[in-house]
Amino acid sequence: GEWIGFLDSDDYVAPEMYERLYRAAVEQGAQMAVCSFAYVTPDGRPIPRTSPITKNEVLSGIQMMERLAGPQNWYYITAWNRLYQKKLFDAVRFPVGKLHEDEYTAHLFYWQCERVAIVKEAMYYYVQQDGSIMHTESVRRRVEGAAGMLERADFALEHEVCSLAFASCNGALGRIVFAKGGSEEERQVLRQVREQADRIIDRLLRVPGYRTEKVKVAL
C-alpha cells in the first residue's frame, strides 16, 4: 500500500479510524492525517483529558512543527494517532532501540509535508498501563527523551523554526535536571546529552528574544 499507520500493542483503535484518516488525507491532498486520541484504563473506562485537537483543519508542515512547541504537544508528537504517506519514510526511519522514537522523528515527518489533515474525533484509544513507558520514571526514559528533544531543537534552529527550538530545548533541560541515579552507562549517556544541551544553548542565546533566565534556572 501507499499509506502506513502504527498501533501500539497495548492500545486499540475505532473501526473507522484508518478509513477516516485516509479519506481526509486524499480529500485534502495531504501527506499525513492526524486524529485526536482518548486515554482509557485497561478495561476500557475513559480517563478525562482535554485534547488540543478541537476542529477539523488542514495545516502546513511548518504549522505542525510550531504545534510541537505548544501546550499538550504530545498529541502532535505520538507516532500512532495518524496515517502517513509511505514516501515520507524514504528519508526518515525511527531510531532502533529508543523508548521515545517519536521525539526523534515527528518534526522530520512534518518537514516533508506540504499539507497535514487534522481530524478532531478521538479514534485512537491510548491504554494507561501502570508499567508502560510513559509511566515508568527511569533515567533511561528521561535521557532518551531529552536527546530526542535536543535533536529536534538542533533541526529547528537550522531551519529557523525558533519557537520549536526554544520549546524543545526547555523540555530537554527539564528532563536532564530530573535524571538522577541510574547505571554507569546511563550516567555516561546523560553526560553526553548535557554536553549536547550546552552546545544548543550557546546557539539559542544568540537568537534575539530567547529568555536566558529560564536556561540559567534549569542549569
Task: Indicate where each model-derived feature is located.
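Short, solvent-exposed helix-helix connector turns and helix-capping sites enriched
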Residues: 11, 161, 218-219
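C-terminal, non-catalytic tails of nucleotide-sugar-dependent glycosyltransferases
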Residues: 147-166, 198-214
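Membrane-interface aromatic/basic loop that binds lipid-linked glycans or pyrophosphate carriers
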Residues: 30, 184-219
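Residue-level signal for alpha-helical context at structural boundaries
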Residues: 51, 107, 163, 170-171, ...
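Nucleotide-sugar donor-binding/catalytic module of glycosyltransferases
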Residues: 1-148, 154-155
